[in-house]
Amino acid sequence: GISRASIDKFSVYYDSFSDRLVYPIRNPDGKIVNIGGRTLDPHWKEKGLRKYTYFMSWGELKTIYGLAENRDAILQKGEIILFEGCKSVLLADTYGIHNTGAILTSHLNPNQMKLLAALGCRVVFALDKDVCIRDDHNIKRLKQFVNVQYLWDKDNLLGEKDSPVDRGQETWKKLYEGRLSLR
């Protein structure tokens, strides 16, 4: 599970009224720009609930979740590992991996691409198994500015909808060590 220290670091709280985890989403300067929520109800689909909800509608996201909290570690390592969802950032933080962020969807938008280019460090995409980053136009554009790598589950260690951190630290380590460069 996710450690109390990681929950506190990212200011995650439980909303008993909606049975959701709620968390602030910050811009790169640390200012809260939205509040996200993730249902804990295992029957959310059958009940017609949204898995994720946000206080304000987004339009096009202009931030990367976790960038403000993890900026120092990202710059120190010269690398940012990008997941789809915030849960993966929290789980990686629990594993002691602090150079992470989440794009909060399965594709990179132009605003996020500009943020990553401005960071100037290696970008490692660690998206869910069912996502093929080679089809993403903005990821292809990003490689003009920075070194882009990605995780590929060639040994079928993950379930179809799993994030690379969902199956434990050993699985994560194998996937990370086998990362490939986007050409």
List the model feature ranges, each with a label.
Residues V131-R141:
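Mg2+-dependent endonuclease catalytic cores in nucleic-acid-processing enzymes, primarily RNase H-like
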Residues I103-N109, D128-V131, K154-D155:
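Short, acidic/turn-prone active-site loops that include or flank metal/cofactor-
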Residues S16-S18, K45, L158-D166:
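Short, solvent-exposed polar/charged micro-motifs at secondary-structure junctions
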Residues T100-I103, R122-A126, Q149-Y150:
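Short hydrophobic alpha-helical runs that function as membrane-insertion/retention elements
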Residues I2-L119, D136-H137:
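Phosphate-handling DNA/RNA-contact segment within nucleic-acid enzymes
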Residues G1, L142-K143:
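Hydrophobic, Leu/Ile/Phe/Ala-enriched alpha-helical segments that form helix-helix packing faces
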Residues L75-E79, C121, K140, N147-L158, ...:
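A charged alpha-helical hairpin associated with nucleic-acid processing machineries
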Residues L82, G120-C132:
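Acidic beta-strand-to-loop metal/phosphate-binding motif
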